[in-house]
Amino acid sequence: MARLPLQVLAVSLAVLAWPASCQRLPVLAPVTKDPATRLYTIPFHYGANVVVDSAGPLVWTTCAPDHLPAAFPCKSATCRLANKYHAPSCSESAADKLCDRSHKVCRAFPYNPVTGACAAGDLIHTRFVANTTNGINPVSQVNVRAVAACAPSKLLESLPQGASGVAGLAGSDLALPAQVASEQKVPNKFLLCLPRGLSADPGVAVFGGGPLHFMAQPERDYTKELAYTPLVSKKGNPAHYISIKSIAVANARVPVPSQALATGGAVLCTRSPFTLLRSDVYRPFVDAFAKALVKQGAQGGPVARAVKPVAPFELCYDTKSLANTRIGYLVPGVTLTVGSGKNWTMDGLSSMVEVKQGTACLAFVQMQGVKAGDGSAPAVLIGGFQMENTVLEFDMKKKRLGFARLPFFTQCSQFNFTRTG
């Protein structure tokens, strides 16, 4: 009988330890860059890949003709969430068309982030088949229940070959991160580390937060090195916005018009291959870069030789006239000072893109169809190329963006996707 208290104590300790030992792990997905479109995809289920769209509010895929719609009534909370954000091309497909009258179930309006096309589609139940992770390796397979919208195959136009839909990663309740968080009981945040260039090895996305380790320095957790800035809410837009206080080239502030950066803000957008700048920001930025590069040559650096521009870029150079280093071409650095006062610095690897043999261009593009100072458009749209080899943490609960540039000896493609025993 004397042993009974010890047995009770042992059971009590086991019960107290249970939550820690059964803590739900984040969900892992490899991120592949498509060489033809420069878009990024993740596997979704059973060989089907979907494009990751950091500004997309929904998950959508093509469906079999005989698919069964989910029984979401037209006035249900899920139906309202699925139709909370409409793309401009869907503006006429509003409340009067939310119902499939033949089945009296909810319809949503999936949107192609490249062409801008949209179409009506049933909401369905699906599964995101992936692996949990400890931040070092995959741990075990998991099937995450999710709600998605069906889309006709014509909506796949201009997406990567083999893609069957889009996974929206925006700050909406039916975007993939929020659905994973709800089903897996993990934080509503995700890590994104896009692979550099056209590497065959994938980058990594982790839904639910860190840690995050890479093989080059396996003891180093890059989520501990993040600088943070607030995420800014935009009415009627679930995309991830931040504010930018200033832009500098070679540590000299670019003389953009007063309030230009504050008007419209900045948005992170994987659907754009390169960073877009509104004209009132683009012109002074490009001029500042060109002058800084000339000054660099006059001060003893390599003299860059301009060549005929290659669309959509304006400043292009002969690569033989640019010194190549471990951090890319030796060109003036570009620094974004974000709302928190932290600096997001871009070296030659992030500012210059080789467009053909012997030619590299400044990888920033003027935004089209938008007037200078138009607050309905962002001043800066940070594209996928400039996000590559950078650990990004989108934290929807704390409403902040974390960012950390990887050192030259580490790549987003160096996550160890070998499952642990």
Annotate each predicted stretch with a short phrase.
Residues L6, D34, Y46, V52-P57, ...:
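Aspartic protease catalytic domain
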Residues P113-Y222, A227, L336, G341-P407:
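Glycine-rich flap/beta-hairpin and adjacent strands of clan AA aspartyl proteases
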